[in-house]
Amino acid sequence: LGKFYYKKATTGGFDRQYIKDQNQNLDDIGKDIREVDTKINDHKKAKNAHTSDQIAHSSGLTVAQEIEVEKARIRNLVLNVDGTNIKEVVDARVDRNGTIYPTLRDRLDADGKVVDDIRDDLITRISFKNALSYGADPTGKTPSADAIQSALDEIHSEGGGWLVIPGGTYLIEKRMIIYENTRVTMAADCVLLRGWAGGFFINGRPDDSFSGYSGRSNIIIEGGILDGNYANIDKYPTTAMDSIILGHANNIWIDCVTFKDTITAHAIDANGCNNLQITRSNFLGFIDLSGKRPFSEAIQLGEFVEMGVNQFGAFDGTPNQNVYIAHNHFGKSELLGGWGCGVGNHYSVYNIFQTGITLFDNDFEDCTFAGVRTFKWGEVKILNNRFKRNNECIRISQAAGGIESSKNVEGVQMNRPQNAQNVLIQGNDFYDYKSYGILSFGQIYNNEIAWSDGIRILGNYFKLKAKEVGEYDYEQAIKLVFARNAFISDNRIFGGRRGMWIEGCFNTFIDRNYVSCVDTEAIYVEKSRDKTSTVPKSYHISIDRNEINTTGRNGIFIQNCDHFDIRDNNVLNTNKEQSSTRGRGGIYVENGYDGRIENSRIRGVEKEFAILVKDAATEVNVTNTKGTGRVIVEGDSNFNGYYGTTQDDYIRKISTKSSS
């Protein structure tokens, strides 16, 4: 036990310090007593409270010495009692737990069974099959698919297992079937080289009739390189190949695989999978030999229908759900260019939705169509990815009516457009896109609208190479057509033809963005392209607290929009284009109904006006404008001022325009 220290009286009387020290001593004494009590109780319960050589015996020896003496006497008796070691054999019938077996053989059999059980358990846990043991050729001189399939078949017959393919180059002459409960591990320097017209793996047989997610599941494919062998296209001709085909499955994980030089189709064609993970893999090099598939996806996420995958299973439209795609790289190879699309789909099934899809921390480079294309996907998260040199980075598509994607699973044409909801695009970096950073289209068919609904574009970074204003081509950071309930907030946009394009949208909130150095407008509301009067204009747009610095034309351009609010925006240095035929400035309203422009700060020496509201607009008021330039409000119903009430409490206009 430790030493205990307490305070002594340091004052001459019963004063405040004395009482304080006394209370402190009482508190310390209580703690020390509890500590001693705890140590005593622990000592009583401890298995090693004392070792046997610490305890004295009545003989004068320690307990340890007494035990060793008795053990030596017993050994001597057992070994020498009759000179034949019979007693030693009898003694060996007793095991470590004190169990006495009828014969020594019974004890040996029992112990042997324990050893065998442990061995079998370890084999089950850690054993694997080596592809070389089945005849796979790591030199690539002879085909290896049959040998690898033999190993996979044996694993299947055993109810599951682990196949390892060591380093080397293996010529693959047919597609190999991976069954349920199988793990395939390829060494980092293992190359499966296409040696026929198709790809490498599939998780189904032609005679499988699985539906839903009941197919061959619990599969891991990891490591290695799946090489489409485009360098030898003449020796092994093909027009299209999928490297891996998956369907009707649950719990699939593809990790650390490199897909190289894929031809026309997909690296991974996943249809009707639940709990699909694709991580830390590389998708390098693609070519479209058909000339008809500029949209081909490295990872296709499709419903299980015949037009998507016709290899096995029921064509019941089973969607992918709960998909996690993370830490992957999509780009060029040494031989071929980038993909049409990194992750996406290009068809759908009426009333079936793919949901719960997350794309996190991926690199999409040099995609000629789009880095990511959602097609009627719901509950999507696109987070912390990097997009470089793509034509489009993210395209959000809905299904139109009157096309293949508006048929139900029975093939009946429903003739209706359809949408999914809730796409979150957050924390991504977009560099040097050729057309759009983010592009979304809803669909109108037979006067019915399928909105792109619930898009949230938050905290992203858009950056193009610096150019003089007027030198960009078609690059726009964000374009939304027929979107509803969209939130665009906290984004940073540098460069391009335009910052944001809003067209035929309902309930759009644009807040706290920074837009700099664009050729035309930072925020532009376009006329609706709809000719059916289904969505003739935009409704309910709020443009608040944005920072706009340096535009070729107007900072904010409003037209074809009812019920709009433009509040608390800073607009600087507009009209850099300096058109000789049309004046431009900070905020321009061509037409629209029921708008308000409040608390603007507008500065710059090249603008023609700070704010201009044309007479084609109605019921628009402008108030509390700070900065430089003219505030021009045309039209009888528009005014520079705010609203108050009359003596009898009716709303009325209060003009702030000076009479002088």
Feature names for model-found ranges:
Residues 149, 158-199, 204-206, 226, ...:
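N-terminal extracellular ligand-recognition/capping segment immediately after the signal peptide
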Residues 179-182, 187, 216, 221, ...:
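Parallel beta-helix/beta-solenoid
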Residues 160, 173-175, 188, 194-198, ...:
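Short glycine/acidic-rich loop motifs that flank beta-strands on beta-rich extracellular proteins
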Residues 210-213, 291-293, 305-319, 348, ...:
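Intrinsically disordered, low-complexity Ser/Thr- and acidic-rich flexible linkers and loops
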Residues 1-48, 52-58, 68, 87-90, ...:
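Extracellular "spike/adhesin" assembly and maturation modules
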Residues 214-356, 365, 469-471:
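Right-handed parallel beta-helix
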Residues 131-166:
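Acidic Gly/Asp/Thr-rich repetitive segments characteristic of extracellular carbohydrate-active
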